[in-house]
Amino acid sequence: MNDSEFHQLADELMLQLEETLDQFEGDADIDSEINGGVMTLSFENGSKIVINRQEPLHQIWLATKTGGYHFTLREERWVCDRSGEDFIALLSSACSAQAGETVHFE
């Protein structure tokens, strides 16, 4: 994957996340902000989740209340380098924990 392809895929991922949050109908108030390729999700309890792209490594990084994760694209999925877990599944789980209700990004 070259840098241009990485940027396109990362942009598509951020757009998908933003659209999902815009359509979220739960009780939790989850605010999202994108600035310089970094997406910050802010929750009512003051906690945050940060998603950013690491261009030199062609990775997506996720920082949650419980830890940091690095994801590489494998077979059209962003997969955690450490656990092999899918980005969307891990993000959904982290958002659900921090929002206090179920949040799905799929």
Curated annotation (Swiss-Prot):
Coiled-coil residue windows: none
CDD domains xref list: Frataxin
UniProt keyword terms in alphabetical order: Iron, Metal-binding
Alphabetical list of Pfam families matching this protein: Frataxin_Cyay
GO process annotations (BP): iron-sulfur cluster assembly
Domain of life: Bacteria
GO molecular function: ferric iron binding; ferrous iron binding
PANTHER family on file: FRATAXIN (PTHR16821), FRATAXIN, MITOCHONDRIAL (PTHR16821:SF2)
Xref: HAMAP family: CyaY
Family classification: Belongs to the frataxin family.
NCBIfam families xref list: FeS_CyaY
Function: Involved in iron-sulfur (Fe-S) cluster assembly. May act as a regulator of Fe-S biogenesis.
The protein's name in its UniProt record: Iron-sulfur cluster assembly protein CyaY
Organism the protein comes from: Pectobacterium atrosepticum (strain SCRI 1043 / ATCC BAA-672)
